[in-house]
């Protein structure tokens, strides 16, 4: 005869609400403890790990706030979030560094190029019957000259060259303060 003791009920409640119990521990309590520990030890790699984690946690929170209604339709979302944040938090996986290095940092360093990469769809890969073998830049230049004329194209090039020469003579550069050999 199966027993219906209080211990079995508590265990069932814990299992059913695992995500509700584990999520605050994994997302807030452990990272908070590890962040304070990193500050106290003055370890640069640990500081970087936890700063990147908090940046990503803020982005995840913004995503959840923005899409809270559609996320209610996905009952697996809390488990996916728990799994993903475990990957970000645990230093063995170094997930926060990976995501920051490959997705956030390129966007931060050059937002225009990063968004262009996201929305750029090369026509050659999807066009089974290409009309010409020219590069996309050459095609765009030809279209511009057809629409606006060669004189407008030449003026645009001269304007760009004079702008670049003016910037270089004034010593102005458009580089971020981070070097390319920076850890992240």
Swiss-Prot record:
Predominantly expressed in flower buds and stem. The keyword Transmembrane applies. The chain crosses the membrane at residues 13-33, 51-71, 73-93. The keyword Ion transport does not apply. It is found in: Membrane. It comes from the Eukaryota. One of its GO terms (biological process) is response to abscisic acid. It is a multi-pass membrane protein. One of its GO terms (cellular component) is membrane. Keywords: Membrane, Transmembrane, Transmembrane helix. Belongs to the DP1 family. This is HVA22-like protein c. The gene is HVA22C.
């Amino acid at each position: 005869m199966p027993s219906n003791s209080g211990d079995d009920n508590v265990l069932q409640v814990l299992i059913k609400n695992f995500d509700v119990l584990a999520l605050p521990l994994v997302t807030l309590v452990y990272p908070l403890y590890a962040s304070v520990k990193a500050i106290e030890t003055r370890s640069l790699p640990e500081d970087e790990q936890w700063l990147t984690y908090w940046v990503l946690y803020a982005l995840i929170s913004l995503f959840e706030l923005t899409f809270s209604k559609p996320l209610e339709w996905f009952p697996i979302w809390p488990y996916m979030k728990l799994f993903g944040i475990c990957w970000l938090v645990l230093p063995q996986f170094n997930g926060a560094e990976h995501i920051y290095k490959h997705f956030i940092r390129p966007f931060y360093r050059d937002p225009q190029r990063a968004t262009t990469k996201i929305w750029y769809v090369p026509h050659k890969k999807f066009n089974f019957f290409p009309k010409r073998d020219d590069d996309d830049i050459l095609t765009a230049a030809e279209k511009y000259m057809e629409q606006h004329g060669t004189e407008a194209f030449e003026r645009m090039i001269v304007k760009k060259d004079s702008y670049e020469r003016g910037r270089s003579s004034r010593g102005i550069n458009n580089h971020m303060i981070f070097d390319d050999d920076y850890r992240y």
